[in-house]
A protein has these predicted regions:
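Alpha-helical, largely C-terminal catalytic domains
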Residues: 1-309
């Protein structure tokens, strides 16, 4: 585990947490062996360190499951973003994912790791969830994320072709925060935490994931604005709000903090009824945002201010 992100996450961690991260990364590498050529080697260590810091109390099997689902989302993004490489239209990818979510292993094509691994991941989450109801929310949020990803890929293509103008910041974010799939990842985390909150608490937890997802999407765009500009990918830093405000990096940071505050307010009353779940979501967002401040993830933001005027 020798990369800057892992060091940032684990340098101050308990030795037991470091050991769990190493084991979870090894299990994830074994899981991903059929498609290892699609993933960079350091992503296993980074994701394992991340989930172990977010929820150190979980056992290694739960950590590995969360890493594997995160890796599956990497595969999903690749298929939605790179039609030429995979030869499958984003719309068809979306239809297959939704079909597998509805039909399980019986629907998954046996020779397609992308589909069979999704069916297996959902089965593992279902076994941990029991009859709590979080799995149903997980499936709904993943379906919504897939549909948003398909729509965003189509929108980016139309804008690149000059067939559609740039959206406002608000219109873009309404689609982009769903595409980032933070909500399904967070719900998978809640399932592994195993607190089994009641339906009222679940509603509150689910609601808190909306501002959290927006904060994460904005933090991601703040990090990748230069690369996105080169590749012609939509990024909030190039957009204008409904009120005419240009989205400078400073304005984006302010909105990130506002969304973090909104999540904190929604979670505040859950510290009695669902304390473990609320704490997990707070820690999840804190770590997610923190990762975007690591030096090797940052771009030169003063130059960004000049670019957007």
């Amino acid at each position: 585990m020798n990369n800057k992100l892992v060091s940032h996450l684990l340098d101050s961690a308990d030795p037991a947490v470091r050991a769990k991260a190493i084991e979870a990364a090894a299990l994830a590498r074994q899981w991903a062996r059929p498609i290892q050529q699609e993933l960079s080697d350091k992503v296993y260590d980074t994701l394992a360190a991340t989930v172990c810091v977010i929820a150190p109390e979980l056992d290694v099997a739960d950590h590995a499951l969360l890493v594997e689902y995160s890796l599956w989302l990497y595969l999903l993004d690749g298929r939605l973003d790179d039609f030429e490489h995979y030869g499958t239209r984003p719309e068809d990818v979306g239809r297959r994912v939704i079909a597998v979510l509805r039909g399980g292993r019986a629907e998954a094509r046996a020779d397609d790791f992308f589909e069979t691994s999704l069916a297996a991941l959902v089965e593992e989450l279902r076994a941990r969830d029991g009859c709590c109801g979080l799995l149903e929310r997980f499936v709904l949020r993943l379906v919504d994320g897939v549909r948003a990803g398909v729509r965003q890929a189509a929108l980016s293509r139309r804008i690149a072709e000059g067939a559609e103008p740039l959206p406002t910041m608000e219109d873009f974010l309404e689609l982009a925060y769903r595409h980032v799939n933070y909500r399904s990842v967070a719900l998978a985390l809640l399932i592994t935490v195993g607190e089994h909150p009641d339906s009222a608490a679940q509603e509150r937890l689910d609601a808190a994931l909306v501002p959290a997802s927006r904060a994460v999407r904005l933090a991601n765009d703040l990090r990748t604005w230069a690369k996105d500009a080169e590749e012609g990918t939509l990024n909030v830093v190039q957009l204008v709000a409904h009120d005419g405000t240009r989205m400078t990096p400073h304005a984006v940071r302010d909105r990130i903090q506002a969304y973090r505050d909104e999540q904190a307010l929604l979670l505040d009353e859950l510290h009695r009824s669902a304390p473990a779940s609320a704490a997990a979501l707070e820690n999840n967002l804190r770590v997610a945002i923190d990762l975007y401040t690591v030096d090797d993830l940052q771009f030169d933001l003063p130059d960004a201010e000049q670019v957007v005027g």
